């Protein structure tokens, strides 16, 4: 029986108001998690020693009861982390600032044109307004950038922009074009978003120049990734081009965390779908130990899941290290 689970990510809705080229949630997402279902989770979260709940989606601020959900969880002493596109953050900044201990905003361009090309909306200025508004209410957001062919040349400019808008931190990950299950995908997914062979030396040069020019931002953790981790992103894109192997992945995320989809399905992580017998809305703790989930975790531990070999967001933690870093304002290693 699973005894501890410090971190839970809850997809409160499948709906999304972005139109990202990297994701299909906006095309077909309809389901909202009910407040009643989330209320039934609380005894399991308490027994599992859960300390941090991340609200995600879809776009969590589209849920008509997002504030009630956050208040319910917070009333049980849980620390809350909001993962958002930022489109409606300015509108809800006051309540979000009061309810969430940390906020991460996805931002994939440093100008209106790039943002619109990737996110499908002319909303760049609105997102920056939301970041500034949240910071003014006491929770300076982190910014997360999905690097891809349309924006990788802006790598240093992202850091400058994050500083300018008052972000707490900025992190980077590669666009995931290798996993057919990621980000609500239902159709074949194009790999045209990835860097091409001719882009690789340009990206490498940017990382090399940033090591010197942004040395303090690396040292302070304002840039969450080290130069070495940015080079792993380069290696990932190089592997997609057939030039070398994918970077080795060390991850035990299913051992200290779980993801609950809006329909109640429990997943071992963001990128691997959960088994049919793992339903959090029935008994979350039992779902974690269902036959299907136990078999899936065993496959992951044994390295038999192809998705793990090309993962763009792996994590390795001990339970004690997760507990120590659960105060999110001091947890850059959790990529918030």
For each predicted feature, which ranges?
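Residues that scaffold the ATP/ADP-binding catalytic core of kinase and kinase-like folds
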Residues: 19, 23, 63, 92, ...
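Short loop/turn motifs at secondary-structure junctions
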Residues: 19, 49-51, 99, 139, ...
